[in-house]
Amino acid sequence: ADDINPKEECFFEDDYYEFE
C-alpha cells in the first residue's frame, strides 16, 4: 500500500486499501 487512495491515514499495511 504505497500509491493508493490516501484518503485516510491508515494504509500502512499490505492489504489495507479501503477503496471500492
UniProtKB/Swiss-Prot annotation:
Family statement: Belongs to the flavin monoamine oxidase family. FIG1 subfamily.
Reactions it catalyzes: an L-alpha-amino acid + O2 + H2O = a 2-oxocarboxylate + H2O2 + NH4(+); L-leucine + O2 + H2O = 4-methyl-2-oxopentanoate + H2O2 + NH4(+); L-phenylalanine + O2 + H2O = 3-phenylpyruvate + H2O2 + NH4(+); L-tryptophan + O2 + H2O = indole-3-pyruvate + H2O2 + NH4(+)
A single GO cellular-component term on record: extracellular region
GO BP, sorted A to Z: apoptotic process; defense response to bacterium; killing of cells of another organism
Primary localization class, coarse: secreted
Protein name (Swiss-Prot/TrEMBL): L-amino-acid oxidase L1
Enzyme class: oxidoreductase
Oxidoreductase as UniProt keyword: yes
